From Swiss-Prot:
The keyword Cell division applies. Involved in protein export. Acts as a chaperone by maintaining the newly synthesized protein in an open conformation. Functions as a peptidyl-prolyl cis-trans isomerase. This is Trigger factor. SUPFAM superfamilies: FKBP-like, Triger factor/SurA peptide-binding domain-like, Trigger factor ribosome-binding domain. Keywords: Cell cycle, Cell division, Chaperone, Cytoplasm, Isomerase, Rotamase. One of its GO terms (cellular component) is cytoplasm. Residues 161-246 form the PPIase FKBP-type domain. It comes from Histophilus somni (strain 2336).
Amino acid sequence: MSFNIETTQGLERRVNITVPSEAVEQAVREELKRVAKNARIDGFRKGKVPAQMIEKRFGASVRQDVLGDLLQKHFFNVMLENKVNLAGRPEFTVEQFEAGKELKFTATFEVYPEVQLQGLDKIKVEKPVVEISDADIDKMLDILRKQQATWIETQDVAKADDRVTIDFVGSVDGEEFEGGKSTDFVLAMGQGRMIPGFEEGIIGHKAGEQFEINVTFPETYHAENLKGKAAKFSITLKKVEVMQLPELTDEFVAKFGPNTKNVADLRNEIAKNMQRELKNALVSRIKTQVIDGLLEQNPIEVPTAAVEQEIEVLRNQAAQRFGGNAQQAAQLPRELFEEQAKRRVQVGLLFSEVISSNELKADEERVKAMIADIASAYEQPAEVIEYYSKNKELMNNIRNVVLEQQAVDAVLTKAQVTEKASSFDEVMNPQA
């Protein structure tokens, strides 16, 4: 066998392979012998059919089967012997395949890029430093109380944190518009659900009043025909309710688990949960900065085949999230996922190089610590730990996550890391 590999463009390669006629005919003869052992032809016992008749009856189909085997065998032998990092499937073109002659074919394929990390010392990472304060815990406790709150009807005027029930009809230039009308609409004030000015127009009115408010739709409003338009809403205020928060009693505290017997216990549990959420948020934020830095300093071309595979993964995940199936997933436009798929392939290649160049292996102590951390959020942590330890797929997933974290840590040792004092809210709600 002879071959030569050439670069066509980018990551695309082409290999030209020639297989000697003797090797081709030997493969055909062996396959014909195998077929002859099981061939059934009237007038002959099984396995006793003359070779000429086998050749005449099965020769053409056998040669096609042998061709497929030879293409795969010799192509992948070349790939292995030359340590080619193949991406995706090859496309074969047969140039010569005739009895008694050499087999000549070409295979076009893509390879993964050779990644050589650079610029790690130019990556900038801002690491938030956060202390969870009593005020943070108080705020979270208030959220829990609000989740358990009841609403009491009042005859007072509506305020910014009340709940109201209204009928409304909206119009632009005197004409009602689609989606601008509702009856018995329940609105919890102060949550930013409505366009600017709508809730403010309700504040100060009492149940039973009818009034009009004038507002302007934002330029960023989702409905194209309403962007930036002045609108008038006719409103009937039917009910005003005030929030009544539950008292911090032992009965209230007991709703949050068997380990919370008093307010101090509840505050401790809240602090633990906040610490766990904060830890995960910090890991995610730092990882994102490291990834962004790696991509900026190491722009790499990625094989189309790998991107297409990732697009299919993202398509199926999107379909599953919305209750769809594989057929529906295939109908989702690839453009929706192309950039994300490309980024994921790039990140995978860069992290693989970080792991390889630093000879990293998943730290089993960190694996155990991560499982224990996950289990601590459940009422029976020991059962969760046992469940993970007996599930090979889950354990491998955790090891992969830990290995990624170790790769991030390896980059951080060379990156420019600065610490910044931050609040819990700043880290958990960066867009607020």
